[in-house]
UniProtKB/Swiss-Prot annotation:
Function: Transcription factor; part of the gene cluster that mediates the biosynthesis of hexadehydro-astechrome (HAS), a tryptophan-derived iron(III)-complex that acts as a virulence factor in infected mice. Does not regulate the expression of the HAS biosynthetic genes (at least under the growth conditions tested).
Identification of the protein by name: C6 finger domain transcription factor hasF
Keyword terms, alphabetized: DNA-binding, Metal-binding, Nucleus, Transcription, Transcription regulation, Virulence, Zinc
DNA-binding region(s) from the entry: 34-61
Top-rank lineage group of the source organism: Eukaryota
One Pfam assignment: Zn_clus
Compositionally biased tracts (Low complexity): 1-20
Record has Iron as a keyword: no
Cited InterPro entries: Sec_Metabolite_Reg, Transcription_factor_dom_fun, Zn2-C6_fun-type_DNA-bd_sf, Zn2Cys6_DnaBD
Renumbered residue ranges of the record's region Disordered: 1-25, 68-91, 112-145, 189-219
Amino acid sequence: MDSTTSSSRFSVSSPQSGPSAGIQKGRQRTITACLTCRRRKVKCDHAQPVCTPCQRGGRVCTYVTPQPVSQAPSRVGTGSRVSRTNLRSGQEEIRSRLERLEKLLERAISGGGNMSILPDAKGTSTGSPSDVDQGGNALPNPKCETLSADGYDGALLLEAEGGQSRWVSSLHYALLADEIHDVKMLLGDQSSGAPADSPPSDQPTPPFPFSGSTVESLTPWSPKSAEDCLALLEIFYSNVDPMTRLVHKPTLQRRFTQYINHTYGTRTQSPGVEEAADASRPDHTIHAFEPLALAIFYSAINSLSAEDVMMRFAAEKDALLAQFQRGVELGLGREDFLTTPSIEVLQAFVLLLTCQSREDDMSRTWTLLGLVVRMALSQGLHREPSLFPSSNMDVVQVETRRRLWHQICHLDFRSAEGRGQEPTIADEDYTTLLPRNINDEDLIEGAHPTAETYSPPGFTDMTGHLIRLHGIHCFRRIVRSTYRLERRIKSSVANGNGNLYPIAELQSLFVEVRTMVDEMVNHLQTQYLQYCDPQIPHQRMALGLAAVIEWRCWSIFWLRTPKQYREAVVSPEIRQTVLAKSVSLVESLNMMSDDKDAQKFQWHIGGHACFQSIMHIVSELETPEFQAANHRSLRSRALSVLKRTMDTRGHEVTPMWNVINRIISNCLAKNAPSTFPLSPFQAMFPPNAAIPGLGSSTTVPPQTIAQNSSVSGGSAMATPLPDLSEVGSLDMQDPTLAFDWVSESNALMRRSPLMFWVGVLEL
């Protein structure tokens, strides 16, 4: 007996007499869904004579009609006829689905890179009565959605408007769902076609972690006027966007105009956009943009001082920050951000976390970034967008997805270091390419992306950001390599395997890191640095940023190497250079508060604390190597910068700074002036001055990962070191170029300390 026959019995009473028959009739339940939808386990909209799912799939749609009790004997025969009819239609449907699946499998086997799963032609005509359910809610138009595969392990469900997307894993859905409607239901998207009388348990609830009352309008949390909105947008362009690069500015300008018109009832027109086209955008897309607009307002206020906020907007900075942050949180909750396919909602969340990321308190950011990573995976940002052939994705969306994913990777690495954890995202977890080295004005909305992934050399709006992303990529590889080696060593010791020699393994890793760093340096030099002019502020910022990345690589490797093996693996020359640059970095950060030109980037600089550099200085001052007389000048300079840090940051009350200040205090106590008298060097160069010859390349690395990895094993053996003469200088600049790092550093500081130091602090 098939499932249809058994289903039909629920609506057919048995021809029995007596009390049991009365009980049977009392429990009788009316079936309103068609038998085909019941058998396929999909939601039926009860449309007559053919429901929408059956119409789209070209299936036979049959309903069970309840009969009066007096006609019970004849109803059994009717039910049997219905069952036999549906048995035949079910077999036809099975054959049809099998044919579809066979075609999909053939496409996937023969090369699914160009596979695009579209709905059947049947039932896709627009404007038909079946496109609207009985409650008056419009069902999704299949022509606005495509399901495209990249030829690897899944597909991307793309909507025509708003850049909405969902990642569809091939493991469960991509080859087994024959309609986009089915895919959306399998993914849990029940927003379309849901009946109006759904039970209370199915109604949307405020999502965790931003639980609270849901709101329909975010106007109470918006700025007072459209003029304030435009002023905050300009502040965002000036102070925040150069450090984040999350948006495409022409697209953002157009969307902001729509937002202002929608919120304040104005008729402002975007430059270069026809008014009719601008007004035709549905309001629901503006709702998805509102959290991003409020996040931009938050970031703009966050980048200003309290005095500037009061002067420009006649309000307290803390009050406006609380207002806009609450608006962002309510907007995220309203848009169901945990499951949303909207990339604008995810941009809002990432921008908010970027502004709130502080090296001295990464606990909240670290936790919420776990949500961000899962949201990005759900939207398929971890897959290279240009590999998905779809008419619903233009070049702007391709670049936006790349930028957003790699900003998430950057925050993941930074927060992981701040929490002493291994980065969550690994290189093998994604295929998304780095953003192209191209200006926003050269990306045209609606232009179809090509297979061309070439990123032209030169200096653009993206160059500084790309230099940082290349550095983060190299940092992550070094950290993961050291973690893998650490696990191997610990496992070998635990298993009693004496065939693994830690020093030899670390020396081999040293050679690997050297090769990795050299490749990165050559790429940066070829693609970007040779086109930079140190006389131009933003290009000088890129040069400063690039110069410190190599130092960061060796600093990370040093701190991730167990203490007992460091001196046997890393050469004294590299150790001295890294220590000198660490001191320069902390000196630079201490001077930043006095630089008025750096105020607009102070929100970004203040989120860095140089914990890694401070810990590096403290650890090296305790070694015999830097207690020798030939290092007296560098040692005195290091002690001076630690004392200046105590004076500058002594008022900090965060738990992390309490620990760091205590460590610095203990270090200064051990190295009191009575034990180590000051040298004439300090009289010549104050503690906060740049030191000629040592360079002033600085960056602000995140907090150190646990540097004292406990590794059991024998003492350091005198094994031959790699040929350290082959290790290139940590000064990245090619001496044949016009810009020489050592000789020009002080001149750059005098010309523009803002762009010089902000560049290196951008890491």
